[in-house]
Amino acid sequence: MKTLLTLISLAFIGVIAVDAKTYKLPNDDFAIASIDMPDSWKPKAVDNGIWGQSSDDAVYISVVAVGSDKGVDAEINDTIEMLNKNKVTLDDSSKKENKFKAGEFDATEYLFQGKDEDGPAAVSITLIPVKNKLLILTYWVTTAKEKEHQQEVGQIVNSLKASS
């Protein structure tokens, strides 16, 4: 597998989710970008972003905006803490770095293989520069359900665009 989000995003360029709502990142007042997330993913707004899960809980996606190195470090630490709390273990030796397009942005993905309560899992932490800030997209999937959700994930990732 070359890269998880790279393959997914390339496969579904230009496809738009019909039942999706557009969310501004980090929020409506200070938007630097937007992303569409399907209503079926029960999206939840959080400080500086949004997260949601597929209806079967096999896929988790979050996107947050940060404006400083300190913010990046804090968000990555929060992500690792969330994964640990959800009993996700990552195999550090599996780490791969990939470059791809996330919507209209250049992105750098760090992909890990690991395990969660349902068995083998993959986790991607993607850094996306936007204006003078950074979006951090976290993707966690139960490997057995990955193909089933490729289209929806591709739609979400490729819906990223800059706010005017």
Residue ranges, per PLM feature:
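Soluble non-cytosolic domains of exported or imported proteins
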Residues: 32, 69-74, 147-151
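Sec-dependent N-terminal signal peptides
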Residues: 4-14
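Short glycine-aromatic motifs
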Residues: 22, 40-41, 88-91, 160
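Conserved polar/disulfide-associated segments of primarily extracytoplasmic proteins
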Residues: 47-123, 128-129, 134-136
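N-terminal "mature-domain start" segment
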Residues: 21-49
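Short coil/turn motifs at secondary-structure junctions
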Residues: 44, 115-117, 142-144
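Surface-exposed amphipathic alpha-helical segments
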Residues: 38-41, 136-164
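Sec/Tat signal peptide C-region and signal peptidase I cleavage site
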Residues: 15-20
